[in-house]
A protein has these predicted regions:
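Sec-dependent bacterial lipoprotein signal peptides
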Residues: 1-18
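Long, terminal "pre-/pro-" and other extracytoplasmic accessory regions
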Residues: 20-206
Length: 206
């Protein structure tokens, strides 16, 4: 076989071998940017914590729930980065605090739902429990109602942090959302009570 004929014979074989030996090209996938942690409304957080409380005690009832503002989570109207709730079990004679947080944070806040240690509880002492079915109004709705009747205060205090407190106040028949301009009741000079069942504005506190 001539040199030219041999080259013509070997060329396809060389090309085939080189094609087989090439490493497959990997397609680089661009990673989608991580979503920032999102705040929740009061009812959303309650619905995360209540099943956990029922798992601890089937007769668990809420006594109080409050918002917890976090620097890591951008707040929105009627929403907070973390929430804390106290549930009681008359059958066990115990109370237990649960928290929901969008992120790991100071103050023993863990991402998701976290249960605290059960403590002694005596029926008739302290705040009264209420039925979960009474919680029909969410915090974003409570905020809208409170803000509508608080425009003068908001104009003078546009950057105030807003907090939320849910409890059964002895002055009102239904549980109430207290919309608080400030980090807490004690640190606030203005708050509004909203009926958590009907959504009605009940009282302004100065």
């Amino acid at each position: 076989m001539s040199t030219l004929a041999r080259a013509r014979f070997l060329l396809p074989l060389v090309l085939l071998l080189s094609a087989c030996s090439e490493a497959p090209k990997t397609v680089e996938k661009t990673k989608a940017p991580e979503k920032p942690p999102e705040p929740l409304t009061g009812r959303q957080a309650f619905q995360m914590m209540y099943p956990q409380a029922r798992g601890w005690a089937p007769d668990a009832q809420p006594v109080e729930m409050r918002s917890i503002n976090l620097s890591q989570v951008k707040g929105e109207k009627g929403k907070a980065g973390a929430w804390g709730a106290i549930f009681v079990s008359p059958a066990l004679g115990k109370s237990r605090t649960y928290t929901y947080s969008a992120v790991e944070a100071e103050g023993n806040l863990h991402q998701g739902v976290f249960a605290g240690i059960a403590e002694d509880y005596a029926v008739g002492r302290g705040p009264s429990p209420f039925l979960p079915a009474a919680l029909k109004i969410d915090t974003d709705q409570a905020y809208d109602t409170a803000a509508e009747k608080s425009q003068d205060y908001i104009k003078k205090n546009p950057d105030k942090v807003i907090s939320y407190l849910l409890e059964l106040n002895k002055r009102f028949p239904d549980p109430t959302w207290r919309v608080i301009w400030g980090e807490s009741v004690s640190a606030s000079d203005y708050s509004v009570f909203i009926d958590a069942t009907t959504g009605m504005l009940l009282e302004k506190m100065h």
